[in-house]
């Protein structure tokens, strides 16, 4: 059994999401041969050299799962594209390129975060190309920590404001991109996150049936895609209620 998740946006301010993720690691993920995290795992990441105690605790939890025998694969999202080799080494996970083709029970499956499919959002695509440039990444990683914190806050604030202003079809994937990239990589199944619109879309590419699976974001509930010999099952799950404090 294989599990895929994305868009947890982990941060200290959302202990409910953190608790649900740790529960997943201690529960279902222990039975999985692999766990794939397809981007925006953290709400923000300014560099492996700037890990907070909270982020270190998440890193340690991943390491414990990895040491138990579950392989962990991590892909960059638009919020945590500065996650690097040092974090992955400590966490015991493998950094996946976006996009990547993997084999699930004999079927090639294309995995992506999903932001690169939103080609109608021209201003974002321009920013993405700039930020993902190796020279830009080198400069960003070598800025003073205070500057990186300020820049991350600015980018998050602007992203939220622009997302609210833009039409839904602009911030969603470009329909024409889906068959194009699936044909380019020779797959009949695409799995991605980013859009926060969980669904399994049935497609027709040429004369073949295909599908696009969109993972859900973790906000009021969690989402996970389970893959096994019977196929793909996308389902939400409720967060466990917070522990009640004893009275008196």
UniProtKB/Swiss-Prot annotation:
GO MF terms held by the record: manganese ion binding; UDP-2,3-diacylglucosamine hydrolase activity
Gene this chain is encoded by: lpxH
Annotated substrate binding sites: 78-79, 121, 159, 163, 166, 194
Record protein name field: UDP-2,3-diacylglucosamine hydrolase
Function: Hydrolyzes the pyrophosphate bond of UDP-2,3-diacylglucosamine to yield 2,3-diacylglucosamine 1-phosphate (lipid X) and UMP by catalyzing the attack of water at the alpha-P atom. Involved in the biosynthesis of lipid A, a phosphorylated glycolipid that anchors the lipopolysaccharide to the outer membrane of the cell.
A single GO cellular-component term on record: cytoplasm
Topological type in the membrane: Peripheral membrane protein
EC number annotated for this UniProt entry: 3.6.1.54
Biological process according to GO: lipid A biosynthetic process
Residues that, per the record, bind Mn(2+) 1: 7, 9, 40, 196
CDD domains: MPP_YbbF-LpxH
Catalytic activity: UDP-2-N,3-O-bis[(3R)-3-hydroxytetradecanoyl]-alpha-D-glucosamine + H2O = 2-N,3-O-bis[(3R)-3-hydroxytetradecanoyl]-alpha-D-glucosaminyl 1-phosphate + UMP + 2 H(+)
Magnesium listed as a keyword: no
SUPFAM superfamilies named among the record's database cross-references: Metallo-dependent phosphatases
Cofactors named for this entry: Mn(2+)
Swiss-Prot/TrEMBL keywords: Cell inner membrane, Cell membrane, Hydrolase, Lipid A biosynthesis, Lipid biosynthesis, Lipid metabolism, Manganese, Membrane, Metal-binding
Family: Belongs to the LpxH family.
Cellular localization per UniProt: Cell inner membrane
Annotated pathway: Glycolipid biosynthesis; lipid IV(A) biosynthesis; lipid IV(A) from (3R)-3-hydroxytetradecanoyl-[acyl-carrier-protein] and UDP-N-acetyl-alpha-D-glucosamine: step 4/6
Cofactor notes: Binds 2 Mn(2+) ions per subunit in a binuclear metal center.
Residues given in the record as Mn(2+) 2 binding sites: 40, 78, 113, 194
Pfam families: Metallophos
């Amino acid at each position: 059994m294989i599990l895929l998740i994305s868009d947890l946006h982990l941060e200290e301010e959302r202990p409910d999401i953190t608790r649900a993720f740790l529960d997943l690691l201690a529960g279902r993920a222990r039975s999985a041969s692999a766990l794939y995290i397809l981007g925006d795992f953290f709400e923000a990441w300014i560099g492996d050299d700037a890990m907070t105690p909270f982020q270190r605790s998440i890193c340690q939890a991943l390491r414990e799962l990895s040491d138990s025998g579950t392989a962990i694969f991590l892909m960059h999202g638009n919020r945590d594209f500065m996650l690097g080799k040092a974090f992955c080494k400590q966490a015991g996970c493998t950094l996946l390129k976006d996009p990547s083709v993997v084999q699930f029970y004999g079927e090639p499956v294309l995995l992506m975060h999903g932001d690169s499919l939103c080609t109608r959002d021209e201003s974002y695509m321009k920013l993405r190309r700039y930020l993902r440039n190796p020279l830009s990444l080198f400069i960003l990683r070598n800025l003073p920590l205070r500057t990186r914190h300020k820049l991350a806050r600015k980018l998050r604030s602007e992203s939220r404001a622009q997302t609210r202003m833009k039409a839904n079809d602009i911030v969603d994937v470009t329909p024409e991109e889906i068959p194009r990239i699936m044909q380019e990589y020779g797959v009949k199944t695409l799995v991605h996150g980013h859009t926060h619109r969980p669904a399994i879309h049935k497609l027709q590419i040429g004369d073949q049936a295909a599908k696009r699976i969109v993972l859900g974001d973790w906000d009021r509930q969690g989402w996970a895609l389970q893959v096994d010999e019977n196929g793909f099952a996308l389902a939400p799950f409720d967060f466990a209620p917070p522990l009640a404090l004893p009275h008196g």
